């Protein structure tokens, strides 16, 4: 069989699915989490297999031992935008690096490809080289409320915080879902965040219009949460690399699948001028078409691995995730917020150790190449998913 033809057929199949999920008022405002799940097909099932390494059993960030993901999806109401009331298409996604991460910190590093956005807490990650609490993803205006939820959950787990123990600066990353969601309503509550954290699990990860991805648009199509993983051969250490993204970036002509410029082949995203007057007057989508409808968007990439890496090496992994982003067509536009955060469960950094020194296992830089390659591959596939 001709490999090029196989890839092209897979890309065509993906494009058909994408076109059925185009950003349109009817789809966006009449859908539900259940109906979205029923049409979800992952890229690999269609014949797209980015890269050379094999995925883990779940092909998800939760293939990395100990990593958990929790999500709460808020989808309520329809019709025209009523600021502060609805329609609601938003949520929160949390990644828990390991149990008791406060006392068993994970090495971490970050990379900002383009900074039109926010991921709180990065200054401390850069300074310390570790991560000591869960990561939360949500929409732009909900960052303070979600941070409050993370703090409340941490205080419940560790009552000494701020009294007999350190304080904390939560890591909360945002994308703007205001084109499909009443973002002024800031509908994600402290309770929602604590529920996502309490229900976080190490099993399969729901993708697409769930959690923080509920209102996101990517490459002019419905975007949101995606995940993928790679498991290296034993000859390369047998390590697992997992990636989770919240994709809200790119314009349709940029979308590339398997090296094929799908976005150019299948038309431009809907614009206000291409819709009927009735559509324009009855949709939340239309209300922001003249502003954020043409915005650059953002993407959050979270990378987990059990390879024993330090903060410097994990920052290097974050940079490689940007290459996976580029393989899907992104050029990290001026107005895009492209944030990468990587952590390793391969070592434990103790909380105020009694001894002045402690030991860490360290993967030599000369053996990093397979881990870097796997990061690129998993990032690309997570975005496609």
Predicted regions located by residue number:
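Bacterial N-terminal signal peptides that target proteins for export
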Residues: 2-15
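Alpha/propeptide regions of enzymes that mature by internal proteolysis
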Residues: 29-385
């Amino acid at each position: 069989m001709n490999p090029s033809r196989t890839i092209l057929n897979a890309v065509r199949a993906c494009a058909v699915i994408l076109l059925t999920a185009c950003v349109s008022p009817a789809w966006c405002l009449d859908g539900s989490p259940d109906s979205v799940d029923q049409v979800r097909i992952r890229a690999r099932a269609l014949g797209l297999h980015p890269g050379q390494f094999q995925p883990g059993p779940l092909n998800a960030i939760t293939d990395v031992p100990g990593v958990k993901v929790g999500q709460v999806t808020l989808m309520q109401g329809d019709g025209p935008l009523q600021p502060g009331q609805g329609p609601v298409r938003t949520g929160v996604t949390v990644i828990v690096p390991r149990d008791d991460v406060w006392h068993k910190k994970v090495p971490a590093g970050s990379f900002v490809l383009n900074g039109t956005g926010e991921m709180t807490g990065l200054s401390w990650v850069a300074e310390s080289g570790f991560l000591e609490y869960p990561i939360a993803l949500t929409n732009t205006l909900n960052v303070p409320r979600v941070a409050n939820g993370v703090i409340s959950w941490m205080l419940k787990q560790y009552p000494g915080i701020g009294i007999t123990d350190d304080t904390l600066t939560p890591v909360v990353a945002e994308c703007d879902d205001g084109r499909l969601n009443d973002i002024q309503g800031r509908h994600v509550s402290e309770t929602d965040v604590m529920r996502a954290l309490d229900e976080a699990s190490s099993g399969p990860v729901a993708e697409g219009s769930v959690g923080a991805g509920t209102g996101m648009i990517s490459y002019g199509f419905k975007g949101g949460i995606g995940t993928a993983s790679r498991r290296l051969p034993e000859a390369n250490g047998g390590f697992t690399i997992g990636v989770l993204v919240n994709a809200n970036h790119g314009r349709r002509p940029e979308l590339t699948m398997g090296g094929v410029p799908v976005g150019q082949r299948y038309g431009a995203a809907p614009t206000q001028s291409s819709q009927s007057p009735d559509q324009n007057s009855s949709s939340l989508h239309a209300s922001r078409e003249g502003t954020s409808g043409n915005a650059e968007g953002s993407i959050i990439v979270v990378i987990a691995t059990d390879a024993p890496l330090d903060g410097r090496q994990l920052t290097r992994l974050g940079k490689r995730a940007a290459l996976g982003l580029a393989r899907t067509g992104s050029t990290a536009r001026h107005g895009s917020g492209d944030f990468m955060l990587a952590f390793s469960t391969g070592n434990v950094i103790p909380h105020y150790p009694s001894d002045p020194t402690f030991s860490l296992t360290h993967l030599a830089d000369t053996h990093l190449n397979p881990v870097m390659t796997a990061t690129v591959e998993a990032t690309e596939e997570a975005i496609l998913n």
